[in-house]
Curated annotation (Swiss-Prot):
Family: Belongs to the TRAFAC class translation factor GTPase superfamily. Classic translation factor GTPase family. EF-G/EF-2 subfamily.
Protein name stated in the entry: Elongation factor 2
Reaction(s) catalysed by this chain's protein: GTP + H2O = GDP + phosphate + H(+)
Gene Ontology terms: cellular component: cytosol; ribonucleoprotein complex
Keywords: Cytoplasm, Elongation factor, GTP-binding, Hydrolase, Nucleotide-binding, Protein biosynthesis
A GO molecular-function descriptor: GTP binding
Function comment: Catalyzes the GTP-dependent ribosomal translocation step during translation elongation. During this step, the ribosome changes from the pre-translocational (PRE) to the post-translocational (POST) state as the newly formed A-site-bound peptidyl-tRNA and P-site-bound deacylated tRNA move to the P and E sites, respectively. Catalyzes the coordinated movement of the two tRNA molecules, the mRNA and conformational changes in the ribosome.
Localisation per UniProt entry: Cytoplasm
Main location: cytoplasm
Pfam families from the UniProt entry: EFG_C (PF00679), EFG_III (PF14492), EFG_IV (PF03764), GTP_EFTU (PF00009), GTP_EFTU_D2 (PF03144)
UniProt xrefs under PROSITE patterns: G_TR_1, G_TR_2
The tr-type G domain, residue ranges: 17-253
Keyword field contains Hydrolase: yes
Length: 842
């Protein structure tokens, strides 16, 4: 236990080589917070008696009630290593005291935006996997996100006590189950890893995988056991580590190692991992759980475990907890693994800099980030806002990448839309004070050097959710985070009492600040719309809104899903539109964009900010576009980064560049609100074929061009077999065999389609994967639990947009019904306007 003072932490912050910033990531309910507890307990913040129950990082009341983590929280831990261990660290270190900034992040799929925010400020990740359930859909999503941010993973296989007590497996089965889990993690890592990182796969024999039980508070790595045995037998530790995993066997008769399963006489040999690592654990479990009073003291003496007075009276599970905690304390194994195998900021920023920074890789800011230099200009990324204890104020939570941040320092606050050299989205203000985040508490601190995680007070009015703070005039922004989920479920919110309206508006502002993945907007009919990533996410957001941010009673409409409008074919004739003064004409056609191009745009692979030549090269090589077309992409829409494109295919038009801005503005408007029912367009490419313009500049201003281009876009769109797309969830359901029938019946009722069904080897559980339209997903969890007697656990994550095959313009079809309902709700005319309304005759 360490009694911390802020000064001690501050002095550690200066030795950046000894800092580790890491997050804990996992599938929901695989035990992140419980494991985090055993670490926190060592750092001396919660008392030993409460660990395992305290779930220290779940700071919110609803987290403690629901037993899930919703927001990610940060804590600093302190650890000292012995000199032998420090020698094994492959990077530069200074002394043997280490500061670990740990962020516990939610595992529930609806909150993966929180995970993204946590990942941005860390360099390493502790991936927690359940022994029994193995790698699940969310483990994969989060691992993929972290590898895209160039974050190095280490793995903990948790809940080993379940395998021993509930499933009563044999040693060999347990080994096989471990090795399968490690293999499936490595498959994901090798699929998504970045070459820059080198080999980041995890290997038990190198000590990058730990095994343990968060609830009982014990864990071990192969390295720890190798340590014990190398002292006992006088062998080299490195050699011992290699032998304690994989196909290596020890023959006790000949005292020799072999890699064959049988000895010379054909008798089976026991695998070294089972014999040296699992055997003592299995024996302890057997002796204690079967109440063998005489064996216990003998075993404890052999393993050098000393029980105190009243601990000798315990029996059964309580004794097991105490003994295992003394034999293999979880914190030792995890801290050792974190310190040995995760990179320090100095190491990590070297290869992460170009991915974090938007500007050129040779400007002073980027070089300072690369070197993690505390003396250069400040570069700080704010990844999220954390609500303070007094209503309505937020701490900005972020990481210093270069320079030193001080209380009272004047900084440039750059929002996500800031462009160097321009004034918009830029404030120059002083930071009131800096604070250390410690789970439920904060400690004020004077300054904080590069490589550390910090909270700032007094800049929450100037930033919406994320942004860059800097003191360097020419600095570009740090790159914006890519979220793996998109807000697709929306509700309309009204106040019950009209006098409360200003409070609601204020509350919505705060809500959108506190959650990185909520969209708050206002519809034309004056409704306030809140969009989230799924049912649970929305429920929590609205609960926050009602209780904290606005503090007033609300009326909430049933949830509605966001659709997209798209086209299937090319326009059947050229769409022509004339300007209001009849002096300008625009001719264009619409056509669909391939799904993979749309995905590449949404995933940021094809980026509107990239150099147009480089972008054209990618589109030509990978997606088969014509190079001249790819170079002449005028813009992406909506919002300047969506999956719709304007391509200029005109030949020798006079004054064309003067109207480019107006055309782009009109396209943004048209794609944000399509003609069918006012939803965004997706995968629509508009080719401008010809433009006739008036010779005088005054007759071709924005007021003439913008409405014309919008009408032409609509006409071209409606001529090109318009369709609508609905969002689809990928559902992963884990259940025992007898519950499968119930799952299928619920899925069939909800237009779901099953993609795969497989049994997890060595367990009675089946995993069913299916696609479920989000529109049908409301109340799905409840119905599923009813149909299966509460045995099935669904995990839903947004997967893709699926085009509805039927014609949205015909009210008798499925798509037409959706369109009609949406138009009624928004107070539009009931029938969709025909293309003739937007088309002008010559």
């Amino acid at each position: 236990m360490v009694a911390f003072t802020v000064d001690q932490i501050r002095s550690l912050m200066d030795k950046v080589t000894n800092v580790r910033n890491m997050s804990v990531i996992a599938h929901v309910d695989h035990g992140k917070s419980t494991l985090t507890d055993s670490l926190v307990q060592r750092a001396g913040i919660i008392s030993a008696a409460k660990a395992g129950e305290a779930r220290f990082t779940d700071t919110r009341k609803d987290e403690q009630e629901r037993g899930i983590t919703i927001k990610s929280t940060a804590i600093s831990l302190f650890s000292e290593m012995s000199d032998d261990d420090v020698k094994d660290i492959k990077q530069k270190t200074d002394g043997n005291a280490f500061l670990i900034n740990l962020i516990d992040s939610p595992g529930h799929v609806d909150f993966s935006s929180e995970v993204t925010a946590a990942l941005r400020v860390t360099d390493g990740a502790l991936v927690v996997v359940d022994t029994v359930e193995g790698v699940c859909v969310q483990t994969e999503t989060v691992l993929r996100q972290s590898l895209a941010e160039r974050i190095k993973p280490v793995v903990v296989i948790n809940k080993v006590d379940r395998a021993l007590l509930e499933l009563q497996v044999s040693k060999e089965d347990l080994y096989q189950s471990f090795s399968r889990t490690v293999e499936s993690v490595n498959v994901i890592i090798s699929t998504y890893a970045d070459e820059v990182l080198g080999d980041v796969q995890v290997y038990p024999q190198r000590g990058t995988v730990a095994f343990g039980s968060g609830l009982h508070g014990w864990a071990f790595t192969v390295r720890q056991f190798a340590n014990r045995y190398s002292k006992k037998f006088g062998v080299d530790r490195e050699k011992m580590m290699d032998r304690l995993w994989g196909d290596s066997y020890f023959n006790p008769k000949t005292k020799k190692w072999t890699n064959k399963e049988r000895d010379a006489d054909g008798k089976p040999l026991e695998r070294a991992f089972n014999m040296f690592v699992l055997d003592p654990i299995f024996r302890l479990f057997a002796a204690i759980m079967n109440f063998k009073k005489e064996e216990i003291p003998v075993l404890l003496e052999k393993l050098e475990i000393n029980l105190k007075g009243d601990e000798k009276e315990l029996e059964g599970k309580n004794l097991l907890k105490v003994v295992m905690r003394k034999f293999l304390p979880a914190a030792d194994a995890l801290l050792e693994m974190i310190i040995l195998h995760l990179p320090s900021p100095v190491t990590a920023q070297n290869y992460r800099a170009e991915q974090l920074y938007e500007g050129p890789s040779d400007d002073p800011a980027c070089i300072a980030i690369k070197n993690c230099d505390p003396k250069s200009d400040l570069m700080l990324y704010v990844s999220k806002m954390v609500p303070t204890s007094d209503k309505g104020r937020f701490y900005a939570f972020g990481r210093v990448f270069a320079g030193t941040v001080k209380s009272g320092q004047k900084v440039r606050i750059q929002g996500p839309n800031f462009i160097p050299g321009k004034k918009e989205d830029l404030f120059i203000k002083a930071i009131q004070r800096a604070v250390l985040m410690m789970g439920r508490f904060v400690e004020p601190i004077d300054d904080c050097p590069a490589g550390n995680i910090i909270g700032l007070v007094g800049i929450d009015q100037f930033l919406l959710k994320t942004g860059t703070l800097t003191t360097f005039e020419g600095a570009h922004n740090m790159k914006v985070m890519k979220f793996s989920v998109s807000p697709v479920v929306q509700v309309a919110v009204e106040v019950k009492n009209a006098n409360d309206l200003p409070k609601l508006v204020e509350g919505l502002k705060r809500l959108s600040k506190s959650d990185p993945c909520v969209l708050v907007s206002m519809s034309e009919s004056g409704e306030h719309i809140v969009a989230g990533t799924g049912e649970l996410h929305l429920e929590i957001c609205l609960q926050d809104l009602e209780n904290d941010h606005a503090g007033i009673p609300l009326k909430i409409s049933p949830p509605v899903v966001a659709y997209r409008e798209t086209v299937e074919g090319e326009s059947s004739q050229t769409a022509l539109s004339k300007s209001p003064n009849k002096h300008n004409r625009i001719y264009l056609k619409a056509q669909p964009i391939d799904e993979e191009v749309s995905l590449a745009i949404e995933g940021g692979k094809i980026n509107p900010r990239d150099d147009f030549k480089a972008r054209a090269r990618i589109m030509a090589d990978e997606f088969g576009w014509d190079v001249t077309d790819a170079r002449k992409i005028w813009c992406f829409g909506p919002d300047g980064n969506g999956p719709n494109l304007v391509v200029d295919q005109t030949k020798a038009v006079q004054y064309l560049n003067e109207i480019k801005d107006s055309v782009v503005a009109a396209f943004q408007w048209a794609t944000k609100e399509g003609p069918i029912f006012g939803e965004q367009m997706r995968s629509v490419r508009v080719n401008i074929l010809d433009v006739t313009l008036h010779a005088d500049a005054i007759h071709r201003g924005g007021g003439q061009i913008i409405p014309t281009m919008r009408r032409a876009t609509y006409a071209g769109f409606l001529l090109a077999e318009p369709k609508i797309q609905e969002p689809v969830f990928l559902v992963e359901i884990q259940c025992p065999e007898q519950a499968i029938g119930g799952i299928y019946s619920v899925l069939n009722k909800k237009r779901g389609q099953v993609v795969s069904e497989e049994q997890r080897p060595g367990t009675p559980l089946f995993t069913v994967k299916a696609y479920l339209p989000i529109n049908e997903s409301f109340g799905f969890t409840g119905e599923l639990r009813q149909a299966t007697g509460g045995q099935a656990f669904p995990q839903m994550v947004f997967d893709h947009w699926a085009t509805l095959g039927t014609d949205p313009l015909d009210p008798s079809t499925k798509a037409g019904e959706i369109v009609l309902a949406a138009r009624k709700r928004q107070g539009m005319k009931e029938e969709v306007p025909g293309w003739q309304e937007y088309y002008d005759k010559l």
